[in-house]
Structure formats: structure tokens, C-alpha cells
């Protein structure tokens, strides 16, 4: 049986959660349960390990953090649902699951696509630009780091937020890439991070076959 711990962390500074993910990954062993961390961050730009400084177009009051995830620069802010996936990929392989880093990325993209389908929205991934898009606009960004055969970092789904800071950057390294969010397609009452988080978790668990969940921190996420 595959066990998964889901942590609902509220609004937390980016660097605190990033360092906690690093510590968790460094300290986990073959008996450590996989975890999902659900969180929102106060305004911050994060630069991926392959990030180029020219993709930060203008300076602002928003801090820039150089991080160890894959990819280029992106923006995080309140109203964006983050789902970090701390998954022991090598253990899943040992259990007979056909999974690679690329397939984990695909699973993340598909859980977003299925979440959008729940709202009657047609979203899709692009083979040459990880993430999920609606009519050419990006609604979800992805970035992972693999250490000791285990993943951390994850996805950022724009739900109901101020998209203006994206104008200070080339999002994910793509000049002119337009960003979008869920509230542009449904009523604002329904564009809530807690509702999106519940759907993301359910679809992710179904895709990867997690059949037992432990929910912590008074999460409103419902087990599947």
C-alpha cells in the first residue's frame, strides 16, 4: 500500500519552505512516507538552476531568490496554489511502477489538466515548455529537483491572484508569455485555492496510485 502525507501549510515564506524541503529530502530514508505540501507564498521571484539574469526585466520591491529547482524565473504570490511533491521515485520503481522524472512531470501536468476539466476548462501541456496552458496562456508552472532519487519542489497553479508582477519577468524564460488564472474563467467565489488544492491532490493520487492518505494541519483536503 502506498502511503501519502498531505500537509496544509497556509501562507509561508518561500525560503523557509524551500530549506525545509531540502532538509526533509536529505534526512528521509526508505521508510519515510511520501508527502505533498500545500502552501502559498508571499510575493517572491524564484530563479531556477538554469535561470538567466536577463529574464528579470525590471527591478521592483519583490525579492529574488536563487533556488535549486529546474527551470527559469517565475513569480509566486498569494492566491497561487503551490503543490510541492516529495516523492521517493526510486521506491516507486522498486514497487514495479513505470515512473521516471519525465513521467512525474507528466503526472503533475495531468493532475492540473484534470482539475481544469472539473471546471469545464480545456487546459493542455506543451512538450517543449513544461506547464499547463489555456489558449496559449500559462496557468501553471512546474519545476522539480531530484536528490537521492527523491523529488522536491513541484507546481504553481494561478487561482485568484495579482498577475501584474509577471510583467517584470520573462515567465519561465519565455519573452512575451502571457499568464492567466482560474478566476478569469469561472466565478470568483469558486476560484478558491482550497478547492483547487483538493482537486489537485485527488487527481495526483489517482494518477500515481496512492491509496492511503494522512492529512495534517487541519487540512480541508478530502481523502480519495
Curated annotation (Swiss-Prot):
Fetch the PANTHER family from UniProt.
LIPOYLTRANSFERASE 2, MITOCHONDRIAL-RELATED, OCTANOYLTRANSFERASE
Its UniProt pathway annotation is: Protein modification; protein lipoylation via endogenous pathway; protein N(6)-(lipoyl)lysine from octanoyl-[acyl-carrier-protein]: step 1/2
Miscellaneous comment in the UniProt entry for this protein: In the reaction, the free carboxyl group of octanoic acid is attached via an amide linkage to the epsilon-amino group of a specific lysine residue of lipoyl domains of lipoate-dependent enzymes.
Site feature (Lowers pKa of active site Cys) residues: 138
Family that this chain belongs to = Belongs to the LipB family.
The cellular component terms of Gene Ontology attached to this UniProt record, alphabetical and capped at eight, are: cytoplasm
User: Organism, per UniProt?
Assistant: Haemophilus ducreyi (strain 35000HP / ATCC 700724)
Residues annotated as binding substrate:
69-76, 141-143, 154-156
Q: Where is the BPL/LPL catalytic domain?
A: 30-212
EC numbers for this chain = 2.3.1.181
InterPro entries assigned: aa-tRNA-synth_II/BPL/LPL (IPR045864), BPL_LPL_catalytic (IPR004143), Octanoyltransferase (IPR000544), Octanoyltransferase_CS (IPR020605)
Biological processes annotated in GO: protein modification process
Recorded coiled-coil stretches: none
Q: Which HAMAP family does the UniProt record give?
A: LipB (MF_00013)
- UniProt entry keywords in alphabetical sequence: Acyltransferase, Cytoplasm, Transferase
A molecular function GO annotation: lipoyl(octanoyl) transferase activity
Protein name from the UniProt record: Octanoyltransferase
Q: What does this protein do?
A: Catalyzes the transfer of endogenously produced octanoic acid from octanoyl-acyl-carrier-protein onto the lipoyl domains of lipoate-dependent enzymes. Lipoyl-ACP can also act as a substrate although octanoyl-ACP is likely to be the physiological substrate.
Q: Name its cellular compartments.
A: Cytoplasm
Q: Which residues form the active site?
A: 172 (acyl-thioester intermediate)
What reaction(s) does this enzyme catalyze? octanoyl-[ACP] + L-lysyl-[protein] = N(6)-octanoyl-L-lysyl-[protein] + holo-[ACP] + H(+)
Q: Which residues cross the membrane?
A: none
**Pfam families, A to Z:** LplA-B_cat
